[in-house]
Swiss-Prot record:
Name of this chain's protein: Autophagy-related protein 9
Keyword check for RNA-binding: no
Localization per record: Preautophagosomal structure membrane; Cytoplasmic vesicle membrane; Golgi apparatus membrane; Endoplasmic reticulum membrane
Topology in the lipid bilayer: Multi-pass membrane protein
Reactions accelerated catalytically: a 1,2-diacyl-sn-glycero-3-phosphocholine(in) = a 1,2-diacyl-sn-glycero-3-phosphocholine(out); a 1,2-diacyl-sn-glycero-3-phospho-L-serine(in) = a 1,2-diacyl-sn-glycero-3-phospho-L-serine(out); a 1,2-diacyl-sn-glycero-3-phosphoethanolamine(in) = a 1,2-diacyl-sn-glycero-3-phosphoethanolamine(out); a 1,2-diacyl-sn-glycero-3-phospho-(1D-myo-inositol-3-phosphate)(in) = a 1,2-diacyl-sn-glycero-3-phospho-(1D-myo-inositol-3-phosphate)(out)
Homology family: Belongs to the ATG9 family.
Ranges where the record places region Disordered: 46-106, 112-131, 195-224
Length: 897
């Protein structure tokens, strides 16, 4: 009997599905990595007993000790339940074969859901000994492992779901009714079509098409997998769902296979160009021959590599060459990985590279959820349960697992980023320092699989982890000291080549502003993907400039006007002298080695910068409304600003977050030298607070593992947007109550809860509102306002002499521009009370200031200028004659005088 079972096991491995997708047996489970928390919840309908409780494996770098017992229990239950479906063939014989005709086989193939596993590499050696008849007979057999006896049982249960399983197929496949919210964002069942009927139907994933994905081939020679089959196999055998979804999102951001690869190649060529041109200009040109030379060959040094470049420079060249070779090797592996994602998009999601530039991310999530529904039964890997939890919220949590911790880390202000020196007392975060923080903290707290290490959840490990973190800071400081000279040279040349032409053609761009790195981390919401955040920031620039330009700077204007006059006068004198002697005067040296052309260029640049710095435009002074409108874009309003929106102090605080680009560039260059000292003297003082931070903000999510608690959007958010002053009774697995945070005050708890609720509100708007389902380069369309609301808004915001000089009113008290057109943006938040939430977050805002919030003060869009034409046309139609002409004249000419 044992020999018969061994024969069956030997023949089972030679079936067609085992050649194409690998074997499906309990042996696969022995090689499962337990770093990812997920087991598929198989619910068994057994008479007289309840369904088996699903086991929860910790998603981290440590495995569960009860993993094998749970697996054996599931397999035994499945074996007992599968016996009842044998029907007329249910003799229970282990060695019985089920004959199928070609027509039946074709019918079964149509309704078969691919169940894929991963076999051993030695199976291909035995494929030529099998016959086609044995493959057809064994194609639908499964081996079920008995956990008590360790014997292999073979059931003749076929996989033709419609034909054999019937109504009990759901119990075997584990498809139970969803118990969570029935929505696209948090749902566990296919409910997208009911919620988005107005959206054009997207193409279904190319998984269960008319013809089978598996093509029968000659038994003597196995055929290679097609691109579609390989993509399906990769999807069914994903071992790290976090990394896979991050690759899927990076592919979406990169606009497809060719764009990503070309960008990588061009980045490498940019590095090679900077190194080559800097070396050539410094070693291979004789600058002493420039005044007398007339050709490039006159100043070029022949064989400069042998004669001019020293041994140290040559050694650095060889090191750089090794680095380039390693980058090329890395690019090769990136090519293979990106090509697999390309096949996943093309064959399983039915999304081409050309569509990625315009298709919304919500549609990609939609296709992934459809793919999960169609391929519910997958390989016996640890990601089965995780795939069953795929929705928009879980996908965002997996993609931003580390970023959510960083958002909370920077918002809690527990990092010491300043030095005790006069010019560097303020906390300044630069890109260089940000990269070092990510390397030292995130690289230490998370394992290679991307999950939080469980040692951070153990309070007993606090001292050990803090000491290790301090050592990492000190080591990173030494590495930055060693690399500082090369980084300084590289970034100086990079910024020079990148911004020189921009400043040369438009010197006024020196006064442009952009958000600082710390501002971006404070403005970003939890689970807000990068393309949504960058789009929101891009829409806020114009509003931010309008707010800052409302504050006059008389002292600065006087200074810039004087410098502008002096520099312009010298340029005019030199230009006049050039007209008198155009041939020789341009090369005339005013100082040593400085010609007239040089001074005209420098003075002309100074004049252009001063001219752009002087603000001669007259605008309506209403900084309070402008800042409130800006807050709807940046989602940042500290309590210290309450009641002071119109003051210059708030404007100065905002300018620290929205600084001049030139200042930011200088800070980046200075940080290359200052970062090692911050890593040595400042950040080690925050090591204990950082370890406590990870322990206090970490919660367990079913199917997700340990994530940041603010990114989970707990039930307090989903049930009415209620704000709590304490996180009550939420226990983590390590026995720490989230409400017992003795290190943080109630104000900090309220601040964190407010940001979490705000993040939840905008997350729902991004994914639930069909208006926001646009590509990463597009802006949502605004909904048209009704004629009555437009007329009411027009009557409140447009000037009329009748309003100003009506009886019983004071003309000097009439305020123009109390409601700006930008504040009347159309509503895209139809499903949630945004104004009520903002009133809760900022209770000092009066009702008069938010009376137009219910009209739809959108955070992502405002009404274009063209949308105001119907208002003006309706005005003209309603007011003909002399009074109508006066009304039109005053509205277009006198507003703002």
């Amino acid at each position: 009997m044992e020999q018969s079972e061994d024969t069956i096991q030997h023949e089972r491995k030679n079936t067609f599905l085992s050649r194409v997708f690998g074997v499906h047996s309990s042996e696969v489970g022995d090689s499962i990595e337990t770093a990812e928390l997920s087991q598929y919840p198989i619910q068994i309908a057994r008479s007289g007993s309840n369904a088996i409780d699903e086991s929860r494996v910790i998603e981290s770098d440590q495995a569960s000790s009860s993993e094998e017992e749970d697996t054996d229990g599931h397999d035994l239950s499945v074996a007992e339940n599968m016996t009842s479906y044998n029907g007329a063939q249910g003799s229970g014989s282990e060695d019985s074969d089920v004959p199928f005709s070609d027509q039946e086989l074709e019918t079964i193939e149509t309704y078969t859901i691919a169940k894929v596993g991963q076999g051993s590499s030695s199976e291909d050696d035995r494929l030529q000994a099998d016959s086609a008849e044995e493959e057809d007979a064994l194609l639908f057999q499964h081996r079920l492992q008995d956990g008590s006896k360790g014997r292999n049982k073979v059931s003749s249960q076929p996989l033709g779901l419609k034909r054999i399983l019937g109504s009990k197929g759901k119990s075997i496949l584990g498809k139970e009714p969803a118990s969570q919210e029935d929505s696209f964002i948090f749902r566990k069942g296919p409910t997208w079509d009911e919620e988005n009927q107005l959206r054009p139907e997207s193409k279904r994933p190319g998984l269960l098409s008319g013809k089978s994905n598996a093509r029968l081939s000659s038994p003597s020679r196995p055929s290679p997998l097609s691109a579609r089959e390989r993509a399906l196999w990769k999807w069914a055998n994903v071992e790290n769902l976090d990394g896979f979804l991050q690759d899927v999102y990076s592919y979406y951001l990169g606009n497809g296979f060719y764009c990503i690869m070309i960008e990588k190649i061009l980045n490498l060529l940019t590095l090679l160009f900077i190194v080559f041109i800097s070396t050539y200009m410094s070693h291979c040109i004789d600058y002493s021959k420039l005044p007398n030379g007339h050709k490039f060959s006159d100043v070029r040094v022949d064989q400069c590599y042998e004669t001019q470049i020293t041994g140290t420079t040559k050694l650095l060249f060889w090191i750089f060459g090794v680095f380039v070779v390693l980058k090329v090797v890395q690019m090769y592996f990136d090519f293979r990985r990106i090509h697999e994602i390309h096949n996943f998009y093309t064959y399983l999601l039915n999304i081409s590279d050309k569509e990625l530039q315009t298709i919304p991310w919500q549609s990609v999530i939609h296709q992934i959820m459809r793919l999960k529904d169609q391929n519910a039964v997958t390989a016996n890997v640890v990601e089965v349960k995780a795939k069953n939890h795929i929705d928009a919220h879980d996908v965002a949590n997996r993609i931003m697992r580390k970023e959510n911790y960083l958002i909370a880390l920077y918002n809690k202000d527990i990092l010491h980023l300043s030095l005790p020196i006069p010019l560097y007392r303020t906390s300044t975060l630069t890109k260089t320092l940000e990269w070092n923080i990510h390397l030292c903290i995130i690289g230490f707290a998370f394992n290679e699989a991307g999950f939080l290490k469980q040692s951070f959840l153990n309070p007993a490990q606090r001292e050990f982890l803090s000491e290790e973190l301090k050592k990492r800071f000190i080591l990173a400081g030494f590495l930055n000291i060693i690399l500082a000279p090369f980084l300084v040279v590289y970034f100086v040349l990079l910024y020079f080549f990148r911004y020189f032409n921009e400043y040369k053609t438009s010197p006024g761009s020196l006064s442009t502003r952009q958000y600082t790195p710390i501002a971006e981390w404070k403005f970003r919401e939890y689970n807000e993907l990068y393309h949504l955040f960058k789009k929101r920031m891009g829409l806020s620039y114009e509003v931010a400039n309008t707010y800052i330009n409302q504050f006059p700077n008389a002292l600065g204007d006087y200074f810039f006007k004087f410098v502008k006059f002096i520099s312009g006068s010298f340029v005019a004198i030199l230009a006049l002298m050039t007209v008198l002697d155009p041939e020789n005067f341009l090369n005339f040296e005013l100082t040593a080695d400085r010609t007239v052309l040089f001074y005209m260029t420098v003075l002309g640049t100074i004049w252009a910068v001063c001219h752009s710095a002087v603000n001669d435009n007259c605008s309506v002074f209403d900084p309070e409304d402008s800042l409130k409108e800006l807050i709807t874009y940046i989602h940042y309003a500290p309590k210290e600003w309450d009641g002071r929106y119109h003051t210059d102090e708030v404007k100065q605080e905002f300018c620290k977050l929205y600084n001049l680009r030139v200042i930011l560039l200088l800070r980046e260059l200075a940080s290359l030298i200052m970062t090692p000292f911050i890593l040595w003297f400042s950040l080690p003082n925050s090591a204990e607070s950082i370890v406590d931070f990870f322990r206090e903000v970490t919660v367990y999510g079913d199917g997700l593992g340990y994530v940041c608690k603010y990114a989970m959007f707990d039930e307090n958010c989903k049930k009415g947007l209620r704000t709590n002053k304490h996180l009550q009774g939420t226990q983590t697995k390590y026995g720490h109550s989230l409400g017992d945070d003795h290190d943080s005050s109630d104000e900090e708890t309220d601040k964190g809860m407010n940001k979490m609720i705000q993040s939840y509100m905008y997350f729902v708007d991004d994914y639930q509102n069909s208006v926001n389902a646009v590509g990463k380069y597009q802006i949502p369309k605004t909904q048209n306002l009704s004629h009555e609301s437009k007329y009411n808004m027009k009557s409140h915001q447009h000037y009329s002499w009748k309003k100003q000089f009506k009886l019983g009113s004071k003309p000097e008290d009439f305020k123009i521009g109390s409601v700006t057109p930008r504040a009347l943006s159309s509503s895209i938040l139809a499903n949630k009370p945004k104004s009520n939430l903002r009133a809760r977050l900022d209770p000092e805002i009066s009702h008069s200031n938010v009376q137009f919030d219910d009209l739809g003060e959108s955070f992502i869009n405002s009404i274009p200028v063209a949308d105001y034409d119907p208002i003006e046309r309706s005005d003209a139609m309603g007011g003909n004659g002399v009074l109508g002409l006066l009304n039109q004249y005053y509205r277009k000419s006198d507003v703002g005088r």
